[in-house]
Amino acid sequence: MLKTEHISFQYEDGKQALTDVSIDLEKGNIIGLIGANGSGKSTLFMQLLGINKPSDGTVYFEGKPLAYTKKALFALRKKVSIVFQDPDQQIFYSNVRDDVAFALRNLGVSESEVEARVTKVLDIVGAKDFQHKPVQYLSYGQKKRVAIAGALVLDTDWLLLDEPTAGLDPIGKKIMMEIIERLASQGKKILISSHDIDLIYEICDYVYMLKDGSVLTDGETSSVFLEKSNIELAGLVQPWLIKLHQQAGYPLFKKEADFFAHTGKVTN
C-alpha cells in the first residue's frame, strides 16, 4: 500500500507546492495524475519516493507511516521506482544489458540472478531485439523502454511514469501504451503524470486532478473528464472521445479503437 494523507509541502524559498493532498495508489491499477504546469505533480512524485519529507501530513508505505531513515528509504525505493520523462537522465552505461543490470550488481546480486532478471524485464518491455545495441544508437522510444526495464529489474511494485509518451511518434506511443497495460495486467501499480489527456483517458482507470498544489477532484476516469467545469478550472482540455460524446452525441467510448469499430472505420 502506498498513499498520502493530507500532506503539504513548502520549499525552502517559501513556495507552497502542495496543500492537503491525499492520494491512494490502491484506487486503480493505472492511475493518472493530471494538472497544468506548476500544479504540483513533480513535487508529489518526490514525496512518494521519499526524496522530500512533507511539511504536514503523512506518506504511508506498506500500511505504516514512512520513516525517513536510511533503512526505510532503501526498502521504499526497492518497491517504488520512477521513470523520468527524459530517459538520458537514468541511462548511464553504453550497453543496454549492463545499464539494466546496474542496480542489481550494485546490490551484490549473483550474476546468474542478474542475467535472468535482466532477460525477463527486457522481454517485458520488448527490448530484446536491441539489447546488444550501443545505447547511443537507440531511438528515443527505445531508450524509454530501457529506462523502464531498469526500474522493473528490482521487482518494483509501484511504477511512477513521468510523461511516458512525450517525444514519441504514433507507433512509439502505441508500443508504450501496450507496455503499460501489460505491466498492469502483471500486477504492477502504475501512476502516470502526463499532459497527454487522451492517453490518460484511454489507459487509466482512476484519475487525480491537481490545481495549485491541491487535489481539485478525483474519481474514475470517465467521471472526472465528463465534468467540463473542473477541466477548465484546472487549465486543461477534455479528451477528444469525451468531446464527441458531449458535443456530437456519440456513445461514450473509452478507447479510440472502440469508437472506430462503432463507426465502421479501421485505424492502426
From Swiss-Prot:
It comes from Listeria monocytogenes serovar 1/2a (strain ATCC BAA-679 / EGD-e). Residues 2-237 form the ABC transporter domain. InterPro entries: AAA+_ATPase (IPR003593), ABC_transporter-like_ATP-bd (IPR003439), ABC_transporter-like_CS (IPR017871), ABC_transpr_CbiO/EcfA_su (IPR015856), Co_trans_ATP-bd (IPR005876), ECF_ABC_transporter_ATP-bd (IPR050095), P-loop_NTPase (IPR027417). This is Putative ABC transporter ATP-binding protein lmo1207. ATP binds at residues 35-42. Its EC number is 7.-.-.-. Belongs to the ABC transporter superfamily. It comes from the Bacteria. Keywords: ATP-binding, Cell membrane, Membrane, Nucleotide-binding, Translocase, Transport. GO terms for molecular function: ATP binding; ATP hydrolysis activity; ATPase-coupled transmembrane transporter activity. SUPFAM superfamilies: P-loop containing nucleoside triphosphate hydrolases.
